[in-house]
């Protein structure tokens, strides 16, 4: 069985109710600036996050996300740049292949990027996968930006 990584999952299974709640918050302009998804590894938290991000970033595009069927439009330029990890509105933080923790330099780079203006008027997202691997220095630096977010 071939398992795709969450960033490449174009269809969302079993988490539609959660996505509906997130998209409703977004449409009603009541979504928070921080969302924590918690649960066992492998249940689809990252996949859900990528689907929500695709929904938001393609809402005014020709190749929109399909919220009725929970399908990402593979023709979407946003999807392609997200899949290639080159989307300017998405920053992904995770452990590097050779590391067992998310280090302070990754968080410093995140903070530096968040202090810069966006290239477009679309929302920006930060996805921290495996947040339990943050070391103490990383946690403290991240808490500062979470407690005192800038206007970007």
Task: Label every model-predicted segment.
Residues 115, 140-152:
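Conserved catalytic/switch belt of AAA+ P-loop NTPases
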Residues 1-137:
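Clamp-loader machinery-focused feature within the broader ASCE/P-loop NTPase space
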